[in-house]
Amino acid sequence: MALHPNFPQSPYAILDPAMRWFPADEALRDTSMDKLMPPLVSQLRNKVKEFRDSGYVGARDTSKSLLNWWFKTPHLLPKIDGTMQEFQYFFSQREALETIVYLYDVVGVQDKYDLMRFDSSGAVSTGMFDETWRRFVVKMATGAGKTKVLSLALAWSFYHKLY
């Protein structure tokens, strides 16, 4: 795998879906990129970028408030020397929460058929989903903060239901 030449060094920088990893072998980039990327990821990342860039159009008020609070409001934490330091979520955490909100509020995902609309590979079939519970698609690497995302998703779910 290779990274885009302009890939940011900061884990907080907002990534354009076109600037993710890509095959180092030039031939694979042209012929097999769609086979290397998990089937739902590519389309969803583009849709979530549009959702983010629009200011979360289509999200419920509670969802917008939480997303703006978590990701656009400065959160200052005291350091041991008494100075303040800004806390930020990793971009991967932000994108994961934005994806969940997008799928729930905007798309209205109810079942596997709703998710299959995002399959850009043609490789996903209903037989791959034996269970009937609602799914949300979040792709995160090891060490990217999945536990924190789960805690934010629980808080979002609680306040979303309450308000």
Model-identified regions with their sequence ranges:
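N-terminal accessory nucleic-acid engagement/regulatory domains that precede
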Residues: M1-F87
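Generic alpha-helical propensity signal that fires on short helical segments
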Residues: D30, V107, L154-F158
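Conserved pre-motif I regulatory segment
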Residues: G55-K139
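Walker A/P-loop NTP-binding motif
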Residues: T99-V101, K146-Y163
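The conserved Walker
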Residues: T142-A144
